[in-house]
């Protein structure tokens, strides 16, 4: 039912990833700050978003779009809305760390029906469609259906989290929550890309994840991937 959209998104996500890899670990990142000194954007964020948006408007001119850098675009009031984070994990990217991702979701009448997350450097592609399950394609080309971890206890679980950019307003910034939960779990990871974190949850590579003050574009695609892999997403 949603194959048309998936077949459109796959090359789109990979094309955005190629833009990011072209700048990665180079001297021409064009790093700027946004809301504060901790919140950064790069030339690759802007160019990959423009590439995605242009393709969507060319193929689906009647659709709406919400994206991280450009905000609301396209046709207001459309039954279809695309939710895009062109480069999730910009801090990692700007530091030369390889965990970052392209996140593209499509909503129909407010419900997410397709989600794709692509980690360009790692060569990992995750996707899901409503009622169609969740899948991952590795760099080698192997495709497998995803299923979340079956672990039932915190003591055996490895969790992931992240930290908001509002350190000036909220000094605790999730560190208080981390301190409370550390004694009860096997370990905690901070990968630096919410979309990739959640994709790892869907793949059973991590057992749980929480984060504060995320935006819709951070998690829209990956939330569907988690749900279609048998996971639970709550706010």
Located regions from the model:
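An extended, acidic
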Residues: 147-235
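N-terminal subdomain of lithium-sensitive/metallo-dependent phosphomonoesterases centered on the IMPase/IPPase/PAP
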Residues: 1-87
């Amino acid at each position: 039912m949603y194959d048309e959209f998936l077949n459109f998104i796959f090359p789109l996500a990979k094309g955005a990833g190629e833009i990011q890899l072209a700048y990665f670990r180079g001297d021409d990142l064009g790093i700027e700050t946004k809301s504060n000194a901790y919140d950064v954007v790069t030339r690759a964020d802007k160019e990959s978003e423009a590439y995605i948006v242009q393709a969507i408007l060319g193929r689906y001119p009647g659709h709406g779009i919400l994206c991280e850098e450009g905000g609301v675009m396209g046709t207001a009031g459309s039954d279809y809305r695309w939710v895009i984070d062109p480069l999730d994990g910009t801090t990692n990217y700007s530091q030369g760390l390889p965990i970052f991702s392209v996140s593209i979701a499509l909503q129909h009448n407010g419900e997410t029906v397709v989600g794709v997350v692509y980690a360009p450097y790692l060569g990992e592609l995750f996707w899901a469609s409503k009622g169609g399950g969740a899948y991952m394609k590795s760099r080698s080309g192997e495709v497998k259906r995803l299923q979340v971890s079956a672990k039932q206890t915190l003591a055996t679980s490895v969790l992931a989290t992240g930290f908001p950019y509002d350190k000036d307003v909220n000094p605790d910034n999730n560190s208080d929550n981390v301190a409370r939960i550390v004694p009860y779990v096997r370990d905690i990871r901070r990968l630096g890309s919410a979309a990739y974190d959640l994709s790892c949850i869907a793949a059973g590579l991590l057992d749980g994840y929480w984060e504060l003050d995320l935006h819709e574009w951070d998690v829209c695609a990956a939330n569907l991937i988690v749900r279609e892999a048998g996971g639970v997403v709550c706010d």
